[in-house]
Amino acid sequence: MRQDVANMFNQNAPAPSFEAIRISIASPEKIRSWSSGEIKKPETINYRTFKPERDGLFCARIFGPTKDYECLCGKYKRIKYRGIVCEKCGVEVTLARVRRERMGHIDLAAPVAHIWFLKSLPSRISTLVDMPLKDVERVLYFESYVVIEPGLTELEPLQLLTEEEYMDAQDRLGEDAFTALIGAEAIREILKSLDLPTLAETLREELRESSSELKTKKYSKRLKVVDSFIQSKAKPEWMILTVVPVIPPDLRPLVPLDGGRFATSDLNDLYRRVINRNNRLKRLMELRAPDIIIRNEKRMLQESVDALFDNGRRGRTITGTNKRPLKSISDMLKGKQGRFRQNLLGKRVDYSGRSVIVVGPNLKLHECGLPKKMALELFKPFIYARLDAKGLAGTVKAAKKLVEKEKPEVWDILDEVIREHPVLLNRAPTLHRLGIQAFEPKLIEGKAIQLHPLVCAAFNADFDGDQMAVHVPLSLEAQLECRVLMMSTNNILSPANGKPIIVPSQDIILGLYYLSLDRKGEIGEGMVFADLAEIEHALDAGLVSLHSKVRALYDGVDSDGKPERRIIDTTPGRYMVANILPRSKAIGPELVNTVLSKKAIGKIIDEVYRLCGQKATVIFCDKMMELGFREACKAGISFGKDDMVIPEAKKRLVDATKDLVSDYERQYADGLITRGEKYNKVVDAWSSCTDKVADAMMESAAKMQVSRGKEQVNSIFMMADSGARGSKNQMKQLAGMRGLMAKPSGEIIETPIISNFKEGLTVLEYFNSTHGARKGLADTALKTANSGYLTRRLVDVAQDCIINEDDCGTEKGIDINAVMEGADVVVSLNERILGRVIAEDIKGPDGKLVVPANTYVDEDVAALIDTATVDRVKVRSPLTCETKNGICAQCYGRDLARGTLVNRGEAVGVIAAQSIGEPGTQLTMRTFHIGGAAQVADQSSLEASFEGTVRFTDAEIVTRKDKTIVVVGRRMQVEIVDADGRTRQSFRPAYGTRLMAKDGDKVMPGKLLADWDPFAQPIVSEVAGEARFIDLSEGTTVREETDEATGISARVVVDPRSTSKTADLKPSIQIVDASGKPVKLPNGSPATYVLSVGAILSVSDGDRIEPGDTLSRVATGGAKTKDITGGLPRVAELFEARRPKDHAIIAEVDGRVEYGRDYKNKRKVTIVPTEEGREPIDYLVPKGKHLAVQDGDFIKRGEYLMDGNPAPQDILSTLGVEALANYLTDEVQKVYRLQGVPINDKHIEVIVRQMLQKVEITDGGDTVFITGEHIDAIEFDEANEAIRKSRKKDQREATANPLLLGITKASLQTRSFISAASFQETTRVLTEAAIQGKIDTLDGLKENVIVGRLIPAGTGGGIRQFRRVAAERDLKLKAKRAAAMAKAEEGINLVSLPAPERDTAE
């Protein structure tokens, strides 16, 4: 009894536990079974008594009482009458809460189509009945009749008849000869008459036989819908409603405002319309009204139900009183303000405060300063409880009074409450997980929150008025998670790249940098000191300076961990820094015996963390911060205008460049170069001049300056060099020259800004520089929104990527090598494999095993691999992981934020998305490089960086008369090999490059290897002979273009005006011998060089040609016309897998190139495969584009026919998954590297994995799949596995190609419909899911947040696993018990039963 009473008051009964959610179409019976009664009247409440009207939209009889345990007429009040139905008003006496749960229904007088299935594209109704959507609408909205049963007449089934045609047919053929209906009834009849299993069979037959692509598409689309209905056991006629459900009244409330007016949910208006029209239709039908009136009423009913479900989807939007469109049920779910994103994913949190932040340099790393007033408010409940426990207040009211009066004992209790109770601090926008961290509060006076300076980088906070929010974790579990997982001391490394994120910046760096400088000839040089106190004494006495080279005794630890004292060479400043290092055998004072810039300090913290652990690191960081601030303050570094030193060399350099530019102008005037080439050369000259001036400036700034008889380091140089503030680029603009600027369109303006800010800009220069500045401001505003949207899409696509097992056992992996740009190593192999797991044994050059497979690469293993001189390593990768749901720990490798192998349950998908999205705001929005000041400096030559021997591979070269070598192939590789046979440097010379070294030459570093014209692509003759022009005739294919500025003419190949005569013209140059026969090339084809449109001829008809002579050249437009989509748009383009505008054409097979005929503005290029029995492949190339290959060239699979950015889909289809992953990783990394943002490759790999989850069926075999269907790779593998296991004869497996989906598409096609619906296109996703009867197994994070559970990652994953085990154990026990009972009942001797356990699964 007592339990019952307790249950009665405990309104939060345990929620039913469930494993999955299914969505399907509701049948009319189902809708009626949910309902508690039919709503017959459109009235809501009585406006006098405020009581709901009977049978109306708020009827208490149907939906339940408005007050707890009280019927409407007031006959039964109190809980004792619970469950009684009042005989007077018919209301059940129960909780008013049931008004949120009970549904009603409206019985429609005529069936209506559900607008989601009708208008959500592709329309499911029209697909099933096999009529165009327009026709279906004409039938539904009573414009045409549709023939359902033609009988013996000449009418076709599903033929549309207008009113007149229908009447006419009835007159002609008799009324009963055929059946034709109109409206939703007609469509319902057609859907009802469908026999789905037979239809599916027929469609499968037709699919097998169909030859045309269009039909195949149509059949497979229809078959998909039919299959969905068969699978989900739904009947197609349920898409036509005969009953409309009414949602509970408390979910569409009516609220009285003051002044006798009411605020109501729009849904009530929409329901009212439906009921009004429905009742009117019923009345008209009873009155036997004329057909036309009834039809109009039915159409209006259809429209009102449409508006209720999705207002504005079809026809006019229904508006309310103030011309505002009414919010329909669909609008309640859609968009940022919809149910999903507003209430289910974005909940507000209780117990929080926010205030401005100020710096707290005296805090420890794990502390934050919390204003007393704020703490008092936040911790109120705890204070009340403590006051009560101490007997200082008997009731809550008394406690409240005490707190309000702020009595002294209240403050004491607040101190107790706060001790060891962490709080969460959050700064918006929270772009990555470090945007929320836990701290222990320290009570402070004042009203601002104090923040530790070192965590600013993680929060991206500064103290110019930023605000932060404080949240209080209430439950014990929450406090535990805060302390163990979210404490700022546990987040030392950044999850994006594994480097420390608690790195000092600005003043601290400047102080440490100043401390660590050393100079010759300072006062007190060579002195010896015993300890720190002695040094400080000497410094105070002025006997020694911070930068003097001295020797001192250092108390360290030897290799066995015993304390030892030794003398070290140092400076007083560096000794201070060494003194705060943790004492450990792995770390000595040598670590800080260098100039401490930001990078160096980051490295030191990293080392300390790895070798001495977390606690030592935190203590070290705090000490370092204190030391840095103190010394920066003491040093008193400041700068004035004289610190900006303009280099003497500037005038000389600028004058020299001016001469060079006027020289180019002269060449242009003489017609030696084209306008584009001149532009390129000028821009090039100025950008190298700017760099030289900058170098000269840095050199002069780095020198000591003598001021007031003392040598001083330049303060600005110190700030920039240490990384405290400013950069070389900014210094260049202050004291060098500002350099080239860009127009808003992205082109570079030829005239640079020669002045710097110290000299001041001229009016014209200032005007030129405003472009960049203005564009920068406009960009910043757009950037934030774009970057946020990219992050959202990334999180959405990767949210269900969780570490679910320890090892999937795969042997696959991807190859990794160092990233090179030209001859420079940008990212070493060492850095790239750190924290990965090796996939196959690594052997050294001598074949000895260096590292076995499945080794986890930590710093030591990486160093080992580095010494073994291997240049590529195969590592496990998320891309090749074979775990079913999620990724395994071995394939993922190191958890970057902890520096150890990743734990199970880590949400690596979200971490990847945040790591890529968080720096998004730092990327540019530009389609060109760096801000206003443009940088071009196109390489035009290459020098050797190492000593070694030159080696040519795939050499295709000709030697000219002057003994220079010209490259005439596209696959040639030039390498420099050292004495051990290791390749130290390699590059692919472009076609037309001049090589300065021969195969086998010995070279020294700095030797010029090659040079080329970066601004023109030449065509070079490989043989000697005479030039003969083919189809090159003045006026049709060649035009003399006279330059207005110079009067010099050049002959340019133009596109002939297309007429039948000129259609087959192929402008080309042939090399012929003395007898007039074409000379043969080495590969046996005649020496004919086809010219593309825009080529400038360099020879005349009949000229004598030597090998290596340039026949023509194509200017490659302004500084790189290849649209450099940079920054954010490029990252988005890559992740969305969009085809670039002028994408490269990739050869799909090895073969010989043949030029085909020309079409209007395309040219046909064919590759004839070398493989036997393969069909030649044709490509259509735009005419004006320069082709990378000549007629007759041999091309390998994956090489480019036409240059440009390749389309990722092409890479996937020709070169496979690994090549695609490498391409995407490299391209994304290029964008981030340009901004100096380090991101680990594995994050990009996780996202790419999510983009590659689907396959496209190429042949269904004997599975249920349809050709052309997109399905999950996992489902595909399972289906094939089933066929393999069935072992039936001649059963074929399905085949498929991997499919690359952009992140938006991939999110919308995830297995979880709840997650997809909450992302975008809510209605479409739900419609699709309902038809398929989809089941959401709640695997991802989003789905679980939406249904209100713990997420299956981190601690939530552990609890989930625990519950699962418990439930399985319970089931076994129950089964055991049941078996024992059964045995007992049979009369066999009774077995002792296991004691009943409590159901632990709940």
UniProtKB/Swiss-Prot annotation:
<comment type="function">
    <text>DNA-dependent RNA polymerase catalyzes the transcription of DNA into RNA using the four ribonucleoside triphosphates as substrates.</text>
</comment>
<dbReference type="Pfam" id="PF04997">
    <property type="entry name" value="RNA_pol_Rpb1_1"/>
</dbReference>
<feature type="binding site">
    <location>
        <position position="86"/>
    </location>
    <ligand>
        <name>Zn(2+) 1</name>
    </ligand>
</feature>
<dbReference type="GO" id="GO:0008270">
    <property type="term" value="F:zinc ion binding"/>
</dbReference>
<dbReference type="Pfam" id="PF04983">
    <property type="entry name" value="RNA_pol_Rpb1_3"/>
</dbReference>
<dbReference type="GO" id="GO:0003677">
    <property type="term" value="F:DNA binding"/>
</dbReference>
<dbReference type="InterPro" id="IPR006592">
    <property type="entry name" value="RNA_pol_N"/>
</dbReference>
<comment type="subunit">
    <text>The RNAP catalytic core consists of 2 alpha, 1 beta, 1 beta' and 1 omega subunit. When a sigma factor is associated with the core the holoenzyme is formed, which can initiate transcription.</text>
</comment>
<dbReference type="InterPro" id="IPR045867">
    <property type="entry name" value="DNA-dir_RpoC_beta_prime"/>
</dbReference>
<comment type="similarity">
    <text>Belongs to the RNA polymerase beta' chain family.</text>
</comment>
<feature type="binding site">
    <location>
        <position position="71"/>
    </location>
    <ligand>
        <name>Zn(2+) 1</name>
    </ligand>
</feature>
<dbReference type="Pfam" id="PF00623">
    <property type="entry name" value="RNA_pol_Rpb1_2"/>
</dbReference>
<feature type="binding site">
    <location>
        <position position="881"/>
    </location>
    <ligand>
        <name>Zn(2+) 2</name>
    </ligand>
</feature>
<feature type="binding site">
    <location>
        <position position="808"/>
    </location>
    <ligand>
        <name>Zn(2+) 2</name>
    </ligand>
</feature>
<dbReference type="Pfam" id="PF05000">
    <property type="entry name" value="RNA_pol_Rpb1_4"/>
</dbReference>
<feature type="binding site">
    <location>
        <position position="464"/>
    </location>
    <ligand>
        <name>Mg(2+)</name>
    </ligand>
</feature>
<feature type="binding site">
    <location>
        <position position="89"/>
    </location>
    <ligand>
        <name>Zn(2+) 1</name>
    </ligand>
</feature>
<keyword id="KW-0548">Nucleotidyltransferase</keyword>
<protein>
    <recommendedName>
        <fullName>DNA-directed RNA polymerase subunit beta'</fullName>
        <ecNumber>2.7.7.6</ecNumber>
    </recommendedName>
</protein>
<feature type="binding site">
    <location>
        <position position="462"/>
    </location>
    <ligand>
        <name>Mg(2+)</name>
    </ligand>
</feature>
<dbReference type="InterPro" id="IPR012754">
    <property type="entry name" value="DNA-dir_RpoC_beta_prime_bact"/>
</dbReference>
<feature type="binding site">
    <location>
        <position position="73"/>
    </location>
    <ligand>
        <name>Zn(2+) 1</name>
    </ligand>
</feature>
<dbReference type="InterPro" id="IPR044893">
    <property type="entry name" value="RNA_pol_Rpb1_clamp_domain"/>
</dbReference>
<dbReference type="InterPro" id="IPR007066">
    <property type="entry name" value="RNA_pol_Rpb1_3"/>
</dbReference>
<dbReference type="Pfam" id="PF04998">
    <property type="entry name" value="RNA_pol_Rpb1_5"/>
</dbReference>
<dbReference type="GO" id="GO:0000287">
    <property type="term" value="F:magnesium ion binding"/>
</dbReference>
<feature type="binding site">
    <location>
        <position position="888"/>
    </location>
    <ligand>
        <name>Zn(2+) 2</name>
    </ligand>
</feature>
<keyword id="KW-0804">Transcription</keyword>
<dbReference type="InterPro" id="IPR042102">
    <property type="entry name" value="RNA_pol_Rpb1_3_sf"/>
</dbReference>
<dbReference type="InterPro" id="IPR007081">
    <property type="entry name" value="RNA_pol_Rpb1_5"/>
</dbReference>
<dbReference type="InterPro" id="IPR007083">
    <property type="entry name" value="RNA_pol_Rpb1_4"/>
</dbReference>
<keyword id="KW-0460">Magnesium</keyword>
<keyword id="KW-0479">Metal-binding</keyword>
<keyword id="KW-0808">Transferase</keyword>
<keyword id="KW-0240">DNA-directed RNA polymerase</keyword>
<dbReference type="GO" id="GO:0003899">
    <property type="term" value="F:DNA-directed RNA polymerase activity"/>
</dbReference>
<feature type="binding site">
    <location>
        <position position="891"/>
    </location>
    <ligand>
        <name>Zn(2+) 2</name>
    </ligand>
</feature>
<dbReference type="InterPro" id="IPR007080">
    <property type="entry name" value="RNA_pol_Rpb1_1"/>
</dbReference>
<dbReference type="GO" id="GO:0000428">
    <property type="term" value="C:DNA-directed RNA polymerase complex"/>
</dbReference>
<keyword id="KW-0862">Zinc</keyword>
<dbReference type="InterPro" id="IPR000722">
    <property type="entry name" value="RNA_pol_asu"/>
</dbReference>
<dbReference type="InterPro" id="IPR038120">
    <property type="entry name" value="Rpb1_funnel_sf"/>
</dbReference>
